[in-house]
Amino acid sequence: MYAIIKTGGKQYRVTEGQMLKVEKLAQDVGQSVKFDDVLMVAAGDELHIGTPSVKDAAVTAEVVDQGRQAKIEIIKFKRRKHHMKRQGHRQDFTAVKITEIALGKAKKEVKTDGA
């Protein structure tokens, strides 16, 4: 079983037990986070595609780590002028472990009168 979730402006294909680095989340280490924006769920032969998201589907994960990526160095220069500008950037991330992919019942029983 796998799902495609959307968080931080990006889409991720996740399975249960998978470790994943996503854009920074506000939760602390050890807390649980629930991703409700599930775009697709595949369970065996069944395939549920959302328009734009699957109803009653959720992916639960546990926050494992908060950190920063490796530094990316940016160098801008103008040729023949000995003009250079150096800059670095480190993106914040949250490492999560996917604990559960839940696909709720979208169909609800409707009670009708026997009249």
Curated annotation (Swiss-Prot):
Family the entry assigns: Belongs to the bacterial ribosomal protein bL21 family.
Pfam family, one: Ribosomal_L21p
SUPFAM superfamilies assigned: L21p-like
PANTHER family, per database record: 50S RIBOSOMAL PROTEIN L21, LARGE RIBOSOMAL SUBUNIT PROTEIN BL21M
PROSITE patterns: RIBOSOMAL_L21 (PS01169)
Cysteine pairs bridged by disulfides in the record: none
Assigned keywords, A-Z: Ribonucleoprotein, Ribosomal protein, RNA-binding, rRNA-binding
Listed GO MF terms: rRNA binding; structural constituent of ribosome
Origin: domain of life: Bacteria
UniProt record, GO biological process: translation
GO terms under cellular component: cytoplasm; ribonucleoprotein complex; ribosome
Function: This protein binds to 23S rRNA in the presence of protein L20.
Keyword Cytoplasm belongs to the record: no
Quaternary structure annotation from Swiss-Prot or TrEMBL: Part of the 50S ribosomal subunit. Contacts protein L20.
UniProt keyword annotation of Glycosyltransferase present: no
Protein name: Large ribosomal subunit protein bL21
